C-alpha cells in the first residue's frame, strides 16, 4: 500500500509510478480519509509507502495529523513490523522533513526503514521571491524524475534501509524548525485567497481541484473558501484556474501556474 497526498499532481504521479514499478496494487489518497484515526491493514509481506510533497520544509499538516493517529497491523497480527518507506517530492530542498515524518510515525510505534526524495517542478507561489519554474527547468526536472523513480523502486524491491536523499539543503534545521514552524503558523491558511470576479468564468475547476474539499460555489456560482482550518495552501485552486482569477493576496498577481501533465513526463 502507498499512502499519498498531492495538490497539483506531482506526488500523485510519483506514487502511482512507484506503485506500478513495484507491483503495488493499493494507492490511497490521504486527503480522501476525512475521518481519522486511520487504520492500515497490510497483508503479510506487503510494504507501506508514504509519499508527500514538502510544504515549508516539512510534511503537510494533514499528513502529520493522520499519521500521528494511525494504527497499523499486518495480517491478523498487530505486533509484526512491516517494511515502511517514504518518498517526498520537492521543488528545492527537503530540510528535516523526513525527521519530522519519522517522529510522527514513532508516536504510533511505526519505524521508517528507508527514505527518498524526488525533485519535481515548483508549485509554491505564496511568497514574493517564490514562483513556478521556467519551462526548461520543468522539462529537466520531469526528465530527471523517471530514472530517479526507477532507482527508488529497485531499492524498495530490495528492501533497502537508510536515507537516499539528494536535496536536503545547507540549513536543514533552520529551514524546517524555525522557518518551517513560522510557515505553518502564518502561511498555511485560506484567508489570503480571493477571486478576481471580473476574470472568473464560474467553471468550478478550482473547487473540483481542492484535495481536501475546502471550497464551494456560492449562490451566484462564485468560488468561496470554507475557512474551516482544512486548507493545505497547496495552491491547487490557483494553478487550475484557466483565467488566473484565483489570487493569494497580491503576491500571485504576476506569478505563473503549473499543473502536472502526464504528456510531458
Model-derived regions, located:
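Positively charged, low-complexity nucleic-acid-binding target-recognition regions
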Residues: 252, 264-265
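Iron-sulfur cluster-binding cysteine motifs and their immediate structural context
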Residues: 195, 201, 205-226, 236-253
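Active-site-proximal loop/hinge segments that shape catalytic or ion-binding/gating pockets
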Residues: 258-263
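Short Cys/His-rich zinc-binding micro-motifs
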Residues: 200, 231
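FMN-binding flavodoxin-like domain, especially the glycine-rich phosphate-binding loop
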Residues: 1-2, 8-13, 17-33, 44-52, ...
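Feature detects long, helix-prone N-terminal segments enriched in hydrophobes
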Residues: 34-40
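Reductase modules of NAD(P)H-dependent flavoproteins
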Residues: 164, 187-198, 207-208
Amino acid at each position: 500500500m502507498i499512502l499519498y497526498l498531492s495538490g497539483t499532481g506531482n506526488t500523485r504521479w510519483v506514487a502511482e509510478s512507484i506503485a506500478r514499478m513495484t507491483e503495488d496494487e493499493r494507492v490511497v489518497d490521504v486527503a480522501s480519509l476525512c475521518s481519522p484515526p486511520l487504520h492500515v491493514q497490510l497483508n503479510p509481506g506487503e510494504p507501506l509507502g508514504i509519499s508527500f510533497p514538502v510544504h515549508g520544509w516539512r510534511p503537510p499538516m494533514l499528513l502529520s495529523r493522520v499519521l500521528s493517529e494511525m494504527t497499523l497491523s499486518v495480517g491478523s497480527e498487530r505486533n509484526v513490523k512491516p517494511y515502511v518507506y517514504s518518498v517526498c517530492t520537492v521543488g528545492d530542498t527537503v530540510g528535516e522533513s523526513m525527521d519530522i515524518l519519522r517522529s510522527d510515525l514513532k508516536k504510533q510505534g511505526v519505524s521508517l526503514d528507508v527514505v527518498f526524495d524526488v525533485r519535481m517542478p515548483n508549485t509554491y507561489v505564496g511568497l514574493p521571491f517564490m514562483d513556478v519554474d521556467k519551462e526548461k527547468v520543468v522539462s529537466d526536472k520531469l526528465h530527471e524524475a523517471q530514472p530517479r523513480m526507477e532507482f527508488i523502486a529497485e531499492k524498495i524491491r530490495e528492501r533497502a534501509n537508510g536515507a537516499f536523499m539528494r536535496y536536503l539543503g545547507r540549513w536543514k534545521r533552520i529551514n524546517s524548525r524555525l522557518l518551517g514552524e513560522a510557515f505553518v503558523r502564518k502561511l498555511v491558511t485560506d484567508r489570503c485567497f480571493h477571486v478576481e470576479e471580473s476574470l472568473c468564468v464560474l467553471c468550478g475547476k478550482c473547487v473540483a481541484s481542492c484535495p481536501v474539499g475546502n471550497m464551494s460555489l456560492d449562490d451566484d456560482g462564485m468560488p468561496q473558501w470554507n475557512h474551516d482550518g482544512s486548507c493545505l495552501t497547496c495552491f491547487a485552486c490557483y494553478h487550475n484556474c484557466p483565467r488566473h482569477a484565483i489570487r493569494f493576496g497580491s503576491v500571485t498577481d504576476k506569478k505563473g501556474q503549473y499543473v502536472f501533465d502526464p504528456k510531458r513526463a
